[in-house]
Regions:
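N-terminal membrane topogenic signal
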Residues: 1-13, 187-196, 227, 247-251
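Helix-loop-helix hairpins and the membrane-proximal interhelical loops
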Residues: 34-80, 307-314, 320-339
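Alpha-helical transmembrane segments of multi-pass membrane proteins
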Residues: 15-28, 205-210
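Small-residue-enriched transmembrane helix starts and helix-helix packing motifs
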Residues: 41, 45-52, 58, 80-95, ...
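Juxtamembrane and boundary regions of transmembrane helices in multi-pass small-molecule transporters
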Residues: 1-5, 139, 143-194
């Protein structure tokens, strides 16, 4: 045995043993935190994986297969004008109702297609913060001032962070740009308007399938919520027709999917039907072969890479801070006590605390409403957003 090599493995095993040996099992705080972690990851799996992440993986896979690399390089590539690249990247998330987890596969998709690290990072940072629903809800509940500050701050800081990432990894980006410059231009793809319509159908399906229930039972948002599955179904039908007309899917495959959706929609409920239709679509893409099977393979690749990391992150967030309104290892009153006022310390604590919290898109607004009512300052609230 070579201890000069094996000592690290021994320390890892020893640390794991001591950690398990001294686990504070039976302590109310620890047991509650473990329960919160499991509750949060279960809620996440039920509320976000099927209706939110699965469509996002399909969109990311479609980006890597159907979006022309020349188009990505033109607007977001390392050789694009910085004003254009960062401008497009920082505001393009405005039309997507995505949370910080859903944006990850989209970020991976555009980066793999040749987008520069800086613009891709700007999109990753700004996307969850500036979608239209989040900005409108923030302005309505937390005030117009915070709504505008959130939108402007997300765009500005995304550009700053993107520029910093480009600076820190400039050598790698220069090498990547040199390799891309030597690559031959790809073949001409479909007309741009067809690609736009195709992605619009998928984005609308994602938006309507994840449309949350508003607080008020009347008004535009409530009306959309009442029709969400009809609207999502219309977007899914449009997507199916597009796949048949432009992408080579067979008519009988679309007919089978429609039959399943109509026959099982009322009996099984929306989510079960959505899951069954997703499996049916995956099977149809696999049977079709060609670029449709490549789309399925790319989507599965993103899911396999990202899902374990996301679930692990949600578990850690639940263990440390618990669900909203519940306790984790870190007492919530500590957070509330440390972020009162608008001082530098409160803003710093809010920013650090936010890094360990998981919020889906929109639920963070009522949570912050409660914190603001408890004395949280406007500055820390914006930092937490």
């Amino acid at each position: 045995m070579n201890w000069s090599v094996e000592w690290k493995a021994f320390l890892y095993v020893l640390a794991a043993f001591l950690g398990v040996y001294y686990l504070p099992v039976g302590q109310p705080r620890f047991d509650g935190a473990v329960t919160e972690a499991l509750q949060l990851v279960r809620w996440y799996a039920r509320e976000h994986v099927l209706l939110c992440l699965v469509p996002a993986f399909f969109i990311a896979g479609a980006i890597s297969i159907f979006v022309s690399q020349a188009s990505v390089m033109k607007y977001l590539g390392a050789g694009a004008r910085k004003v254009t690249a960062y401008g497009v990247a920082s505001v393009s998330g405005g039309i997507l109702a995505v949370c910080s987890c859903t944006v990850l596969p989209l970020f991976a998709g555009i980066y793999r297609m040749g987008a520069g690290l800086g613009p891709a990072t700007a999109f990753l940072y700004a996307g969850p913060a500036i979608n239209v629903l989040a900005i409108i809800l923030t302005a309505r509940i937390l005030g117009l001032q915070l709504g505008i500050a959130r939108a402007v701050g997300a765009v500005v800081f995304s550009i700053v962070i993107g520029l910093l990432m480009h600076f820190f990894f400039r050598r790698e980006e220069e090498e990547r740009a040199a390799i891309q410059a030597q690559m031959p231009a790809g073949p001409e793809g479909r007309p741009l308007w067809q690609t736009v319509v195709y992605f619009a159908a998928m984005v609308l399906l994602l938006v309507f399938a994840t449309w949350g229930k508003p607080e008020h039972v009347a008004g535009f948002w409530a009306a959309v919520y009442g029709m969400k599955w009809w609207l999502a179904g219309a977007a899914a039908l449009a997507l199916g027709l597009i796949l048949v007309r432009w992408y080579g899917m067979k008519w009988y495959q679309l007919g089978l999917l429609l039959t399943v959706g109509i026959n099982f929609g009322y009996a099984w409920g929306a989510q079960a039907t959505f899951a069954l239709l997703t499996l049916g679509l995956a099977l149809a893409l696999w049977k079709a072969g060609g670029e449709l099977r490549e789309w399925l393979d790319a989507s599965w690749g993103f899911a396999k890479q990202i899902m374990p990391l996301l679930l692990a992150g949600v578990l850690v967030a639940g263990l440390m801070l618990g669900r909203p309104g519940h306790e984790g290892l870190i007492p919530s009153e500590w957070v509330a006590r440390m972020v009162g006022g608008n001082g530098l310390g409160a803003n710093f604590v809010a920013a650090i605390s936010g890094a360990f919290m998981y919020f889906a898109t929109l639920p963070e607004v009522p949570i912050l409403q409660g914190l603001l009512g408890a004395g949280m300052g406007q500055g820390p609230a914006l930092a937490l957003l």
